[in-house]
Amino acid sequence: MSAALSAVLLATSVPSAAFAAVPAKTADVQTKAADENELKLWYDEKAPDSYDGWEKWSLPLGNSGIGASVFGGITQERIQLNEKSLWSGGPSASRTNYNGGNIETTNVNGVQTKMSKVVKQIQEAFASGNTSTAESLCAKLVGVSDDAGTNGYGYYLSYGNMYLDFKGITESSVSNYKRALDLHTAVASVEYDYNGTHYVRENFVSYPDNVLVTKLTATGGSGKLNFDVKVNPDNEKGGGSNNPGANSYQRDWNTKVNGGEITVAGTLKDNQMKFNSQTKVIADGTTTDGTDKVTVANATSVTIITSIATDYKDEYPKYRTGESAEALDTRVGGYVDKAAAKDYDTLKANHVKDYQNIFERVDLDLGQIPSDKTTDALLQHYKAGTATEAERRLSGSHAVPVWSLSDDRIFP
């Protein structure tokens, strides 16, 4: 089931950019060999490091529990992280009378009215053709939402971001840049050439191993991988800078770094939900622990393994596992340690096999050919009405996006 949802997640995320204006290109679209681009979203530039860039241009990955969006930056890679159970709202020590958001009466024109009567009024308004009154009354059926979280109305929260800050690279000197999401394997990649060295990053979120895996390589020439790894939880609504400060999005956490592993552990202030993430950095060069980061130096191959979890449990009335912070730490560490005991090729093979078990059940051939144009260029031609017949078959404008970084973001 989860693998199927992962397939749907990737497939339906394809056309999310089709619903938005496409930024103008400043140079000719770089062409690629067509057979390399079958079932791929690919671009010749990074996603803007902004809310708009996240929503329309980052590359989404997920395993039904952990979500990741890859921006593909050159001097700084940003991978936005999510964990499906990280919600504010619900039972809390500050809400002893919390009743699941159910309300028995609501205020209609200054009078507390039973919900059953409101429903009857809505039906009568629709029947008489008074849609404006019906719509106004429908709003009375919705639980109260407030940023302070006093009513227990919850929001889905961004976990935070993993940042890879690269050293010794001048972005303007990079060539042959390509950022792609392969729908056949559910792997997001970034590659480019710099000073005679070919740099590649691969990312996937494995359902069998319950981890996000990021692999970086540097081949050819004398170039090495030199960068810092950081994991920064969000303390703002939706993980963006657009709505900071409200209590229902705030959290407390500690970051510890030991032996090339970054552990973030904390609680949400609103409902005391515990969360934990662990990120292990494995490199063929050197790794150095910092206060809140791991520094990689002189490497040609680096694997980063991350897992995230909370103490949420779908069980009335507390909706918690009852785990201590230490027990949650042990559980997340177990995922990471088991995955780290496998080599990268094994992790990737496990992921691809699991994903393709579902994805390859159906193959739809519309007579299209792999495109030699980037995905954003295809969308530009489609919107302008200049796409060829074959290119129109590649358009995803008929499908529906499933991701949103806002507080009501949908996640499988």
Task: Identify what each model region corresponds to.
Residues 10-26:
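Sec-dependent signal peptide cleavage junction
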Residues 1-8:
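Sec-dependent N-terminal signal peptides
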Residues 22-412:
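Aromatic-residue-lined binding/catalytic grooves and analogous aromatic/hydrophobic interfacial grooves
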